[in-house]
């Protein structure tokens, strides 16, 4: 007799190496909590609908809990010959309680069973990711609060462009994460749907109650189409996309952390707790955590591409190709959660070298736009002002000086309307103060931005 749940149709057994290739237990054992949760809801519903007895249901439920506990305590080992988490649990259940265990699968297929597990898992993980993002945002806001008046060079093309507030710069990542969080929150509408009861693809002849299992499992909605219920993996693609994009944002931040911590920049000092050394160069302090996060975006994006290609051209309904949805999702979720925790600790513990930042911004031409704006305030057309300032900058480069070093007489050779007040106008501090357009880097604008950000975080906490 075959030990396969589907063995009745077959005359020969697969060889062991075929079982190993076919099996998913090595990774879908991670779904034991969700599988037991779904089976308990299903057993409860079967009893309620008088498909099995109350005693049978209670026996099933009690032993499912014992199986989960035994596995988590290392007392139970699953077998590749039983393929997956579903059949391993069912086999163990029947071994323990006999015939009643074989009734659990009534009105259910592994197709809707695994879909239910994956919906439960993805929902739980997305909710946790949302919490991690919000926590990291809190850390960013706290750091920004301390550095509203800290001035640093703003860059375009990795060339110094204009003076900006350090708070304004790092708050950019708050808003990236806010969009990421919003995407995850919105995706819950498409994750929080119960496929349980769809069976293999067409529903079941048994008088099941899908609304009851939906309620027991805490799903917000039901799939309206049984074929769609077992075929849908859109929510996994969507989750992988949101993870990948969040990782892209973390990667961009990591690149800046790496640059800021170089001896050439010295804008920040990373904590030893988030750095490593060299096995040959004793002086080294490497930003390995930031580098790892920057690199890990490759694997999460790879999982997204893999899932999209796996689904391309798949006919309805379930196909074994769908077994490939799990490892990538599990790894991507693990990667993002770890990256968010590491990044929060790294940012919370890093030292911002305010004096170095302010000194750096005094030795460049990032106030050149300010000089052009000054001329515009003297009724000079902007394009003309741009040309004049370009010539002044070129002259300064030849002389090895900066705009604040140019004598007034030399300024007036370029335009007679330039007066003594130009020197106050061009200080980095005043460059910031004058930028008060909504969302700009000026102190008052940044303070308002922080107020809005704090209100958003408080609002999210109350939901």
From Swiss-Prot:
InterPro entries: Arg_succ_lyase_C (IPR029419), Argininosuccinate_lyase (IPR009049), Fumarase/histidase_N (IPR024083), Fumarate_lyase_CS (IPR020557), Fumarate_lyase_fam (IPR000362), Fumarate_lyase_N (IPR022761), L-Aspartase-like (IPR008948). Signal peptide: none annotated. GO terms for cellular component: cytosol. Keywords: Amino-acid biosynthesis, Arginine biosynthesis, Cytoplasm, Lyase. It catalyses: 2-(N(omega)-L-arginino)succinate = fumarate + L-arginine. SUPFAM superfamilies: L-aspartase-like. It is found in: Cytoplasm. GO terms for biological process: arginine biosynthetic process via ornithine; L-arginine biosynthetic process. Its EC number is 4.3.2.1. It is an enzyme of class 4 (lyase). Its main location: cytoplasm. Pathway: Amino-acid biosynthesis; L-arginine biosynthesis; L-arginine from L-ornithine and carbamoyl phosphate: step 3/3. Belongs to the lyase 1 family. Argininosuccinate lyase subfamily. This is Argininosuccinate lyase. It comes from Staphylococcus epidermidis (strain ATCC 35984 / DSM 28319 / BCRC 17069 / CCUG 31568 / BM 3577 / RP62A).
């Amino acid at each position: 007799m075959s030990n396969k749940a589907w063995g009745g149709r077959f005359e020969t057994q697969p060889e062991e190496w075929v079982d190993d290739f076919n099996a998913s237990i090595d990774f879908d054992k991670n779904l034991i909590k969700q599988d037991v949760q779904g089976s308990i809801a299903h057993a409860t519903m079967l009893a309620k609908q008088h498909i099995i007895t109350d005693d049978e249901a209670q026996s099933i439920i009690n032993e499912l809990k014992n199986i989960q506990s035994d596995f988590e305590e290392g007392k139970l080992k699953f077998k590749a010959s039983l393929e997956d988490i579903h059949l391993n649990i069912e086999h163990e259940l029947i071994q323990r309680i006999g015939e009643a265990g074989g009734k659990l699968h009534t009105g259910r297929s592994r197709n809707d069973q695994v879909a239910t597990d994956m919906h439960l898992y993805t929902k739980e993980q997305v909710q946790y990711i949302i919490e991690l993002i919000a926590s990291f945002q809190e850390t960013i806001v706290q750091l920004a609060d301390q550095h509203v008046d800290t001035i640093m060079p703003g860059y375009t093309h990795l060339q110094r462009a204009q003076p900006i507030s350090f708070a304004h710069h790092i708050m950019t990542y708050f808003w990236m994460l806010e969009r990421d969080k919003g995407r995850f929150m919105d995706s819950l509408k498409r994750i929080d749907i119960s496929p349980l009861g769809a069976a293999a693809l067409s529903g079941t002849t048994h008088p099941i109650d899908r609304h009851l299992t939906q309620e027991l499992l805490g799903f917000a909605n039901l799939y309206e189409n049984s074929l769609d219920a077992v075929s849908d993996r859109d929510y996994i693609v969507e989750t992988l996309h949101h993870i990948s994009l969040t990782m892209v944002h973390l990667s961009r931040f990591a690149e800046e952390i790496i640059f800021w911590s170089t001896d050439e920049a010295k804008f920040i000092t990373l904590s030893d707790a988030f750095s490593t050394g060299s096995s040959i160069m004793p002086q080294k302090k490497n930003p390995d955590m930031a580098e790892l996060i920057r690199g890990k975006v490759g694997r999460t994006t790879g999982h997204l591409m893999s899932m999209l290609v796996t689904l391309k051209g798949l006919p309805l309904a379930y196909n074994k190709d769908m077994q490939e949805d799990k490892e990538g999702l599990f790894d991507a979720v693990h990667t993002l959660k770890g990256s968010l925790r590491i990044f929060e600790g790294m940012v919370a513990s890093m030292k911002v070298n305010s004096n170095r930042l302010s000194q750096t911004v005094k030795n460049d031409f990032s106030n050149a736009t300010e000089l052009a704006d000054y001329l515009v305030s003297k009724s000079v057309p902007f394009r003309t002002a741009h040309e004049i300032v370009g010539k002044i900058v070129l002259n300064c480069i030849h002389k090895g000086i900066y705009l604040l070093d140019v004598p007034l007489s030399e300024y007036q050779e370029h335009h007679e309307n330039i007066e003594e007040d130009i020197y106050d106008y061009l200080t980095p501090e005043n460059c910031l103060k004058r930028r008060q357009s909504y969302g700009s880097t000026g102190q008052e604008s940044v303070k308002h931005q922080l107020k809005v950000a704090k209100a958003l975080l408080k609002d999210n906490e109350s939901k």
